[in-house]
Amino acid sequence: MNFNTELKKNIGCNIVYSSSGGGNCSIILMKFDNGNHIMTYCYWEVQKDGKLIAISEDDITAVTGLVARTIRLFENQKVVDIEIDEGLNLFIEVEDGLTLLVFRDEYDHEDLEMLGDSQDWDYAVPSEDLVLYVMEDSTIKAGKCSSPRSDPLKLIKMD
């Protein structure tokens, strides 16, 4: 399976929901009109035409905070590019020049032993009952949308 190929299926889709801030802190939930969605749990930045306009550490006040207002700007926008790099960082660009850059947390080799079974971000394809989890230890695991997160995940290799 090629993760970038899977993600690129969202190019041309509209973002129908994009939320962060408030009780969600800086976690982002972004839904596409094809039913797929992404959730992020790590540091992110939003740029407009290459200029930084918000980061995950900005004001997370519900509705009115910079995080909430900025992430809502993605709603009703068409995805023009989406990809991951070799470090499994995620990049989503929409038609009006907004770009979401999701940077995975970096860990020292010694820290890897202390990591739990947590993800930095995940990508769900409900039509295929598939969730791909980008884990803190730089692995990718697959689960089912219809299964509880506590069910065992399958380690997968990506092209």
Predicted segments, located by residue:
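Surface-exposed, interaction-prone regions used to assemble/regulate multi-protein complexes
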Residues: 1-159
